[in-house]
Curated annotation (Swiss-Prot):
Database matches in NCBIfam families: BPSL0067_fam
Compartmental location: Secreted
Domain of life: Eukaryota
Upregulation: By feeding (in both nymph and adult stages). Is responsive to IFN-gamma acquired in the blood meal from mice infected with the bacteria B.burgdorferi, leading to induction of antimicrobial responses.
Membrane-spanning ranges: none
Primary role: Tick gut and saliva antibacterial peptide that directly antagonizes host skin commensals which enter the ticks during feeding. Acts as a cell wall hydrolase that cleaves the bond between gamma-D-glutamate-meso-diaminopimelate of a peptide stem and D-alanine of another peptide stem in peptidoglycans. In vitro, degrades peptidoglycans from both Gram-negative and Gram-positive bacteria. Is not able to traverse the protective outer membrane of Gram-negative bacteria. Is not able to kill Borrelia burgdorferi, one of the Lyme disease-causing bacteria.
UniProt note on tissues of expression: Detected in salivary glands and in the gut (at protein level).
Name of this protein: Domesticated amidase effector 2
Organism name: Ixodes scapularis
Residues forming the catalytic site: C43, H94
Position of the signal peptide: 1-35
Disruption of the gene: reported phenotype: Feeding interruption, and proliferation of bacteria in ticks.
Length: 142
C-alpha cells in the first residue's frame, strides 16, 4: 500500500510538471522565413508569437522550468524552451521550440536575427557558447 501511494504521488507530480510546459504551434510551416514580433527577428520573437500567451510577457517574467536533457522523455513536442544564464536562473541566451532529444543534443526550431526559422540540433557540451549548449536548456514557465 505504501509503495502504491508513493507511486501515485510521483505520477501526479510528473503530470503537474508536464502541465506547466508552454505548448507551441507547429513551427515547421515557417521554415525559411522569420517570425516577426515586437522582438523583431530575434529568437524570442518566434517563441513569443507561436507559444501559448508568451507574447503578453517580457522575458524577465519567464521562469526556469524542467531541465530539457534530464527530462526529455516527459517534455511534449513543440514546447517553449530557453537558456536561463543570468544569476538567479533568469532568462539570458537563446529561446527555441523543442522538438525532440538525440543522444548528442536536442532538436529544436529556432531563429535569430541572421537566420530564419529552421530545424536544427543544438549539441550538448558546447562550453564555448553556453547559449547554444543543449545542456543549458529548460522549459519556460510563467
Amino acid at each position: 500500500m505504501k509503495l502504491f501511494l508513493i507511486s501515485a504521488a510521483l505520477v501526479v507530480l510528473g503530470l503537474a510538471a508536464v502541465a506547466d510546459a508552454i505548448g507551441c504551434s507547429d513551427p515547421s510551416p515557417f521554415q525559411g522565413r522569420w517570425v516577426i514580433g515586437v522582438d523583431k527577428k530575434e529568437c524570442v520573437a518566434l517563441v513569443k508569437e507561436k507559444c501559448g500567451n508568451l507574447r503578453d510577457y517580457t522575458t524577465g517574467r519567464w521562469v526556469r522550468g524542467q531541465h530539457v536533457k534530464s527530462n526529455c522523455g516527459s517534455i511534449p513536442k513543440f514546447t517553449a524552451i530557453a537558456t536561463f544564464l543570468k544569476p538567479g536562473n533568469k532568462y539570458l541566451g537563446h529561446a527555441a521550440i523543442f522538438e525532440s532529444c538525440a543522444s548528442d543534443g536536442i532538436w529544436v526550431y529556432d531563429q535569430w536575427n541572421a537566420k530564419p526559422v529552421e530545424r536544427r540540433k543544438i549539441r550538448y557540451g558546447n562550453t564555448g557558447k553556453p547559449n547554444y549548449n543543449g545542456d543549458n536548456f529548460y522549459t519556460i514557465e510563467l
